[in-house]
Amino acid sequence: MVSDAGTPAISDPGFLLVRACVEAGLEVTCLPGPTAFVPALVASGFPCDRFVYEGFLPHKKGRQTKWLSYKEEERTIVLYESPHRIVKALEECVNFLGADREVCVAREISKLFEQFVRGRAEDVLKHFQQTPPKGEIVLLVKGI
């Protein structure tokens, strides 16, 4: 299985194919490849020894519940988000986790326009309200 959008089976249904191969008794080998969240996590400056990878937040149902579950999370939270929903995600972060919660938005990892915006959730929100982002985004939230 090969993907032109990061490591197969990370935030996509590729695991179904892997599971079917395993169940059929086929050998599965994985070569390390590009996954945006690993370099984003390392370069965020947040603790990397314990983190939780959540992938994409639900679009509607269960979204608020997810945010509320992060309120007491001690580990660094790693999320994928689309450029047209990052402002909404940051607004929710401010509302549910607090304006002072530290976040890092990593954008276009390993590409020409790679960018890291770090700081208080409220300040990072203001940045992206004024400058709408483009490209692939990883949102990292520091644990408590």
Language-model regions: role of each:
Residues 8, 35-38, 111-112:
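Short gly/pro/ser/thr-enriched loop/turn and capping motifs at secondary-structure boundaries
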Residues 11-15, 64, 87-90, 118:
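Conserved strand-to-helix beginnings and helix N-cap segments that scaffold or border functional pockets
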Residues 1-6, 10, 77-81:
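Acidic beta-strand-to-loop metal/phosphate-binding motif
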Residues 7-10, 59-60, 113:
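Short, small-residue-enriched loops and turns at beta-alpha junctions
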Residues 76-144:
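A contiguous loop/helix-start segment that scaffolds small-molecule binding in enzyme catalytic cores
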Residues 2-4, 50, 104-108:
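Short beta-strands and strand-loop turn motifs
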Residues 12, 16-73:
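Class I SAM-dependent methyltransferase SAM-binding "motif I" and its flanking Rossmann-like core
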